[in-house]
Amino acid sequence: MTSDSIGDMLTRVRNALAARHPKVDVPASRLKAEIARILKEEGYIANFKVAEEGVKKVIKIYLKYSPNNAPVITRIERVSRPGCRVYVGSGDIPRVQGGLGINILTTPRGVMTGRMAHKEGIGGELLCQIW
């Protein structure tokens, strides 16, 4: 049992990309499904689906690679952790790699990218950065 389920999900994705696996399974939760939805919308993963394996639900994340078999996700980092939460206002949302990457935030209006949160003028907890 891990105390940081989002960190565990990001680590599983990072390890699967390093090993060039076509997909990775992570234990399901609504927050992890929302993070996977954003990754799909932004083009970082090919697809995902929530499936039931026996009693437990899992999220199957289908990873995306470029034509020369390099992972589309160069780096994926956890920012806010259970031991050190990081909250940002709408004006304090950092740019990732000069605008080439994305932030994922959890806000009062749900999970969204840093760009969407800035556009709506809301801040929240900065979960992770991807580029």
Language model region names:
Residues 1-131:
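Core subunits and conserved enzymes of cellular information-processing
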